Amino acid sequence: MNKARVKSMKKFWLVLSLAMFCLVVASLWEYSLNDWSVDKKLFLFQERLKFEEKRIDDQLRKLDHEAERQNPEWKGKQSVLVGFKGSKLVYWSNERIGSPRLYEILSAGNDLVKINNLYFDVRKHAVGDTVYYALLFIKEDYPYSSNYVKSHFNPSLGENLDDANKVIIRETWEAGGELVYNRDGRPLFKIESRVEHGDVVP
């Protein structure tokens, strides 16, 4: 064989080997960055959730000083306050939620409840013989979507998805997803992202 041809074949294989090595390193680098960004986004989501829980807990503690008032002041567009004496509803801050079994659902003691299509983080506080439940809105989840009705997350928990159907909330005992904890350290729910590259995680 010709020396020039052997030399050019060696260069060809060297360049091909270097290109393959660079592709492998680049794909490993992208994979590690992708994993890191999902972990970071989950961490930020959880921190925002804890911040909102603290804000709600502070408002609930203020109810101790407003016990004599019939209608306590409740601030927050992304939360609902309901109060029960026994099983009788005595206070309802807004009409965002409604269910004939509302007392049963809330008194079961779960930290996460789904009422109709809405997921809520439940914070409980008793003032005298009235038990208040503050419900922090997490996600509105529809089994379908249209131009008028779309699943969406609470905007105070982070950026919203164009299609929140790609992010699934699961019970803590279900398989799949990453655990999200409340500020008391208890598992609240699992979140599983089926978000493609370029979409935004909540």
Positions of PLM-derived features:
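N-terminal sensory and localization modules of signal-transduction and trafficking proteins
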Residues: 1-202
